[in-house]
């Protein structure tokens, strides 16, 4: 079973340098992730996305994030996200569990 606390640690170590999760959080190098689930790629208001992100046209959810977080540049060629990905499925599951809680009310 996915562990949101473990996911929070992964977020702090690997994601927080470029992303925030709280409502009203500022964009950093990457967009604020509040409201991520159910949102189309490239749609966080006020963030400058690449055309690749805007044109991908998928809706973020558990399955799309599982694929994306394994290898972001393979899933969205042309993304400016420099993160290489999380190869361990359990780490992706934990991170997604944390994001589900942290990015919604």
Curated annotation (Swiss-Prot):
Heme c binds at residues 15, 18-19, 81. Keywords: Apoptosis, Electron transport, Heme, Iron, Metal-binding, Mitochondrion, Phosphoprotein, Respiratory chain, Transport. SUPFAM superfamilies: Cytochrome c. One of its GO terms (molecular function) is metal ion binding. GO terms for biological process: apoptotic process; hydrogen peroxide metabolic process; mitochondrial electron transport, cytochrome c to oxygen; mitochondrial electron transport, ubiquinol to cytochrome c; positive regulation of intrinsic apoptotic signaling pathway. The keyword Mitochondrion applies. One of its GO terms (cellular component) is mitochondrial intermembrane space. Binds 1 heme c group covalently per subunit. It holds the Pfam family Cytochrom_C. It is found in: Mitochondrion intermembrane space. The keyword Mitochondrion applies. Coiled coil: none annotated. Belongs to the cytochrome c family. PANTHER family: CYTOCHROME C. Electron carrier protein. The oxidized form of the cytochrome c heme group can accept an electron from the heme group of the cytochrome c1 subunit of cytochrome reductase. Cytochrome c then transfers this electron to the cytochrome oxidase complex, the final protein carrier in the mitochondrial electron-transport chain. Plays a role in apoptosis. Suppression of the anti-apoptotic members or activation of the pro-apoptotic members of the Bcl-2 family leads to altered mitochondrial membrane permeability resulting in release of cytochrome c into the cytosol. Binding of cytochrome c to Apaf-1 triggers the activation of caspase-9, which then accelerates apoptosis by activating other caspases. This is Cytochrome c 2. It comes from Bos taurus (Bovine).
């Amino acid at each position: 079973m996915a562990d949101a606390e473990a996911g929070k640690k992964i977020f702090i170590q690997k994601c927080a340098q470029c992303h925030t999760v709280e409502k009203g959080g500022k964009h950093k190098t990457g967009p604020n992730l509040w409201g991520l689930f159910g949102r189309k790629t490239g749609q966080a208001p006020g963030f400058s996305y690449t055309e690749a992100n805007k044109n991908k046209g998928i809706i973020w959810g558990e399955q799309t994030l599982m694929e994306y977080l394994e290898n972001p540049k393979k899933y969205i060629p042309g993304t400016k996200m420099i993160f290489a990905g999380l190869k361990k499925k359990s780490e992706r599951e934990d991170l997604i569990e944390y994001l589900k809680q942290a990015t919604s009310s």
